[in-house]
């Protein structure tokens, strides 16, 4: 569930961060199609024949997929002339027959692009651009050697950019256990980082030039600018690279060069502290300075730190249910989705508030829409602040839908649930309800919501079942009748009445 929370959170941030795509022309091309069309029947047979193949999982209704399509086709055309040719393919993951395939490759949204190596034995995420030229450049690098040899200062200058992370191995010779382990690391992490190797540290722009190796040097555009490692265990190297490639404080603003670090921030396993303020305000430098001190003091303590400009952070405000009049503010989110909020923050509050968080002295913050003043529709509206009362403490049999306002399947389901609710309108033991999961927090350890709509049934006695049956009116009614129980509140009232009667009789 933690991965779903992080995944959804990340999407909301990136929706406000990503730069717009180039405008797409709508003319139909009569030229040859270079993108292979795969499905369940030919997927594995095709993939097994290629040492390197790229597969897009798409849905016909997906707007981003439609924007990508001509760029992807153009890239496939160009890469067909590469030596050796780079094959691009696509799978309609909306087709019923291909849904199992999409599930196997952990497709959680569209479009999802995977790089498959060694006949499909190695699967990696595509993490490159989505315009034709960007796709071509990225895949040329990905299809080549995982690490580039640095033979000159020019080679080093071309590889080690001021705005990206690069991992370079320095060796006395390109053989032996250390070099093999470095090569294995480069192969494993090539989708995330660029790698190089050299026999001469003097060619490199930063760091001790007299080192003969073996040493791994990570170059980065923040903090201490480079770090040297000498532990050549692959797992240890990977951990060191991952930890060193996250800034002490990640910057979230409109600068596209910060984008990869924002992604890494949300993908790491730490709790996430996020300070939001107006970057044009007079107090911004005071906040930055103190926040960085706190981040450095808590390094290695399981908390990652980000500072975001309110102008660029509307996705976060939507996700957390925050308001501009609460700025400056700080939020900490655990991987289980629990959140803690300190609005109207002063710089000297930061250190003490983070300490209170670490000492478990803070009360969780819960995002909730207002409880409706009138809730008279057949399907009852549930918000975070009324979830306990309406669902868990009502003593009723409750069918609860978790939905998103933008979800097409949810819109299709809405009139059906209305009909189901009307069918039980005069039944005091049954309630049909809905909760906007994008606007309200809910206990993620109780409800496993991986997509929309997700439905749960809570019986009168409190037993919880996830509904995975059909979606007709008859399907829902049959399920409710099969799993319903007598109202626990009604039984309690009867017992209380009986006790009162017995007491009166004794008197």
Curated annotation (Swiss-Prot):
EC top class named in words: isomerase
Leader peptide range in chain numbering: 1-20
GO CC, one annotated term: endoplasmic reticulum lumen
EC assignment: 5.3.4.1
GO molecular function terms attached to this record: protein disulfide isomerase activity
Glycosylation positions in this chain: 181, 278
Cell compartments where the protein resides: Endoplasmic reticulum lumen
Family, per entry: Belongs to the protein disulfide isomerase family.
Protein name per its UniProtKB record: Protein disulfide-isomerase
Species, as recorded: Datisca glomerata (Durango root)
